[in-house]
Amino acid sequence: DNLCYRYKKTSPYVLDGVSLELEKGEIGIMLGRNGAGKTTLFNNILGISRPVSGTISYDGIDMTKASRRQRARKIAYVPQNIQFGTLSVYDSIMLGRLSYFGVRAADSDRRVVENIIKEMKLEELAMRSVSELSGGERQKIAIARAMAQQPGLIVFDEPTGNLDPANEELIILEARKLAKQKNISILSSLHDINQALYFGDKFFFLKDGKIKYAGSHNIVTKELIKDIYDVDVKIITVDDRKVVVKNPMMTIIS
């Protein structure tokens, strides 16, 4: 709430009074041009950076004052690129849990990991090295690692950034299904406005370190996109979904 951040005391604010709220199970999408402040906001939420002022609250707990372990019990992170090494799928997911909650796996940890593998239909991959898997499969393992923390909020940094179109849709559907089934909130950055409209429930458009627009699908208009991205588009409806089109093809806005 009212989050402010700058790199030096004499530098301008990169985040200037940013406020946003997500309900449990709600998917929020951060949008804006490069340099708008999306990564900086995520770093503040994850505890990588500390805000100059303002609060980051979850269930009434001020996350700016929480320990690494306390934060990990509430907030998980899925980066755009994650290094798995030669670990098996099972070990990689377990590591995602033990990194925060203990050095040795207890029976309770094993049950958590085994349930995630079953829920995400990863049984056939469990003993394979993650290095052997496709990009879409690796991204699915990254989501499973985050789920192993049993968080209330998962922060995604461009979850489909390195995937082909078929896998992009699969990952978005998987993440959305888990959010709704587990009542987990998601906050994700995306460059593709059409993916965002497909994935999200609520949208936050950053400009010059401020959230200039916030709301549901209804706020997304050609005037908004012109203001944020300086791009002229048309918005049409396909199968009851808004689609942003830049003649003659759909556009990816970044």
Regions found by a protein language model. Give the residues of each.
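Conserved structural motif at the start of ABC-family nucleotide-binding domains
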Residues: 13-15
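The feature captures the beta-strand-to-loop junction immediately N-terminal to the Walker
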Residues: 31-33
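Helix-to-loop junction immediately C-terminal to a conserved catalytic motif
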Residues: 46
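Conserved ABC transporter NBD signature motif
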Residues: 54-62, 71
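Conserved ABC ATPase "signature" region
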Residues: 108-125, 150
